Amino acid sequence: MANLKALFLRMKSVKSIQKTTKVMQMISAAKLRQVQQRLNNARMHMLELSKIIDTNVVTKNNECTGPHNKKDILLVIMSSDRGLCGNFNNMIVKFAKSYIEELESCGKNVKLLFFGKVAYNMMCSQYSSKILDVFSNIQSITDFLSFKLFLYGSGVDFNQFIGVMVLFNKFYTTILQKPTVEQLMPCNIDISVSLKEYYKYEPAYLNVLSTMSLSYILNLMYIAFLENCASEHSSRVIAMESANNNTKEMLSKLVLQYNRSRQAAITTDLIEVISGFESLGNQ
């Protein structure tokens, strides 16, 4: 009976885990759809912003190239605040460490800025002297404005660095995400010098260009953030689906084991009862 009770309690525990993983899978799937919509909107906005910049940039001597008397490179590493998403965080951490080694082998001094505390927790002991800041509670970022407030709150000035790179898990499909690095500064803006007409700027041209360039960089980073969020939710959907399937398989085995144990217990009881009757009859 003790064995049956232990099996029953274990089955109850597995059923509870199964419900939890199923709910988490449904929540992550809903969040994934929301992030995909935000990502599509951000890409459309970025496309229009790129058109404006491509139309109005008429000189190669713009402020988008950043200062040339600096050796520091800023790496913005995006992960998640929570686990239970497969190897999502492990992939970006492994990729980031490899990329940092590559930059340092070229004589570059690397500084780190983290979105999501999981990658920070995995790397802080090794790169503590290089970390500028870490942003946790990133699930509270619901739009571009809240994203900018997160960045401005850090006090990090991008113009201090000769280059700014963002490392994130790029979202391709629900089952395919890949660690990627994209260059934010110097900006890869197409330079057009054959405009049909020129424009008058108010305020001054360089001020307009500087504002547009900053907006361009922030939008690139925001899109990378959304790509990373989509990858996180996608990885969690797959991980929870796998966990749910595993609990089903485990529950099936436990039910079979429980039924066999109960059958054996019933058989044992019947044998004892029959043996008792037989012994009474013999008397």
UniProtKB/Swiss-Prot annotation:
Highest rank taxon of the organism: Bacteria
Keywords: ATP synthesis, Cell inner membrane, Cell membrane, CF(1), Hydrogen ion transport, Ion transport, Membrane, Transport
GO molecular function: ATP binding; proton-transporting ATP synthase activity, rotational mechanism
GO cellular component, one term: plasma membrane
GO aspect biological process, one term: proton motive force-driven plasma membrane ATP synthesis
Major localization class: membrane
Mode of membrane association: Peripheral membrane protein
InterPro entries attached to this UniProt entry: ATP_synth_F1_ATPase_gsu (IPR035968), ATP_synth_F1_gsu (IPR000131)
Compartment(s) where it occurs, according to its Swiss-Prot or TrEMBL record: Cell inner membrane
The protein's assembly and partners: F-type ATPases have 2 components, CF(1) - the catalytic core - and CF(0) - the membrane proton channel. CF(1) has five subunits: alpha(3), beta(3), gamma(1), delta(1), epsilon(1). CF(0) has three main subunits: a, b and c.
Family: Belongs to the ATPase gamma chain family.
Functional summary from the UniProt entry: Produces ATP from ADP in the presence of a proton gradient across the membrane. The gamma chain is believed to be important in regulating ATPase activity and the flow of protons through the CF(0) complex.
Protein's name in the database: ATP synthase gamma chain
Organism from which the protein derives: Ehrlichia ruminantium (strain Welgevonden)
